[in-house]
Amino acid sequence: MIKKYEGCFLFRSEELEYKSALEEVKKQLVAFGAVDFVENSIGERALEYPVRKQLRGRYEIIEFKMASDNLRELEAQLKLIKNLLRYMILVKINRKVSVKKVKRRNFREYRDNKDIKEKEQPSESNVDADLKVN
């Protein structure tokens, strides 16, 4: 069964190592029958803790469609890529959003923002009272 997946990949931060590992990941995806790639590069970030003695890494998110039977073999091959520090592949779920819920949420946001704006702007009676005191 073909499913939509989203993979988050963490590579070494060096430019050449990053590009070669990214190409290797793409080759493996194609080899296991992945289609409809959508790539999103997040860029280089500092890591919260060292991963394989690396303090910085480059993140790449790739969305693709693939048969679910090939996922285990793909993960086994991804573990062999030297400059790929970590990866996570998730099934992408498209949720249907009810129009009623969206309208209700938008109304609540409008109502809350309206209340905040009224509190920020002084009413005329408060301004008149301040003028009479002074």
From Swiss-Prot:
GO terms for molecular function: rRNA binding; structural constituent of ribosome. Keywords: Ribonucleoprotein, Ribosomal protein, RNA-binding, rRNA-binding. Residues 113-134 are annotated as: Disordered. Gene3D superfamilies: 3.30.70.60. SUPFAM superfamilies: Ribosomal protein S6 (SSF54995). GO terms for cellular component: ribonucleoprotein complex; ribosome. GO terms for biological process: translation. Residues 113-122 have a biased composition (Basic and acidic residues). The keyword Transcription does not apply. The keyword Ribosomal protein applies. Binds together with bS18 to 16S ribosomal RNA. Belongs to the bacterial ribosomal protein bS6 family. HAMAP family: Ribosomal_bS6 (MF_00360). This is Small ribosomal subunit protein bS6. It comes from Borrelia recurrentis (strain A1).
